């Protein structure tokens, strides 16, 4: 992806970009009462480092370098209304998240980004081809809509795996299209994924099946009894 390639190029030029002239992790980060490392809510991005880790020169160098994503990522989000969030998870456990949602205050000190499904799916053991990985659709509590995550492995020029670039995308457009489809005079379309999870179902189709959105919300499996 373009965004993943941008992250790779930044890391390949880390020695030139890590000076902290634009943004300096050593000055910008502080510990919360939970011990998590946090940054100001007024900044463009959220930074999270687990509370059990110290802010080392290695952290500072990488964070200062990747802060240059501030110049491209907000514009990508603005140009793609269905994109909910863009983030980078590093192999050391650090997270840089757009937009700024005060991430460090939302997750526990032992939160391990490297164990998240989207990170694991793009990591070398699960993704030897180094291609983009797509999640199954899931219901997002914040937006109350279906989301998919695309994750892209980030390797530097030496071939070292540095982390995963992720993006959450809403499926609003496809659900609206399916909801507006008519089959014959009275029929309605609905959409399932390969695991029979509901992606889109209009109210009339729910009624035809004799079920309700509360019993079968989007993202849930439509069982054979239905």
Regions found by a protein language model. Name each.
Residues 61-69, 114:
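Soluble or luminal CAZymes and related metallo-dependent hydrolases
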Residues 77-172, 176:
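Extracytoplasmic/periplasmic ligand-binding sensor regions of membrane-associated signaling proteins
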Residues 18-42, 52, 89-104, 193-197, ...:
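GAF sensory/regulatory domain recognition
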Residues 66-74, 171, 175-178:
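Short amphipathic alpha-helical segments
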Residues 29-32, 173-226:
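Intrinsic low-complexity, intrinsically disordered coil/linker regions enriched in small/polar
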Residues 1-62, 78-82, 131-132:
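Juxtamembrane extracytoplasmic/periplasmic/luminal helical "stalk" adjacent to the first N-terminal
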Residues 4, 8, 73-81, 126, ...:
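Short regulatory alpha-helical segment in sensory/regulatory domains of signaling proteins that mediates
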Residues 9, 94-95, 141, 198, ...:
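Flexible, glycine-rich phosphate/dinucleotide-binding loops
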């Amino acid at each position: 992806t373009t965004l993943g390639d941008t992250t790779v190029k930044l890391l390949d030029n880390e020695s030139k970009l890590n000076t902290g002239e634009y943004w300096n992790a050593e000055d910008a980060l502080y510990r919360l009462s939970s011990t998590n490392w946090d940054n100001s809510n007024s900044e463009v991005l959220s930074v999270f480092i687990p509370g059990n880790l110290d802010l080392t020169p290695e952290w500072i160098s990488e964070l200062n370098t990747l802060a240059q994503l501030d110049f491209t990522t907000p514009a990508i989000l603005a140009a793609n209304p269905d994109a909910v969030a863009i983030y980078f998870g590093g192999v050391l456990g650090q997270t840089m998240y757009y937009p700024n949602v005060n991430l460090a205050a939302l997750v526990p000190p032992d939160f391990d980004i490297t164990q998240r499904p989207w990170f694991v799916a793009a990591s070398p053991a699960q993704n030897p081809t180094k291609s983009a990985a797509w999640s199954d659709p899931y219901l997002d509590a914040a937006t109350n809509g279906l989301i998919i995550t695309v994750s892209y492995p980030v390797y530097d020029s030496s071939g070292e795996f540095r982390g995963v670039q992720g993006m959450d995308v809403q499926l609003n457009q496809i659900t609206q299209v399916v909801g507006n489809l008519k089959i014959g005079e009275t029929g309605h379309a609905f959409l399932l994924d390969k695991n029979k999870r509901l992606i889109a179902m209009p109210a009339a189709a729910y009624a035809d099946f004799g079920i309700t959105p509360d019993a079968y919300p989007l993202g849930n499996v439509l069982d054979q009894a239905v």
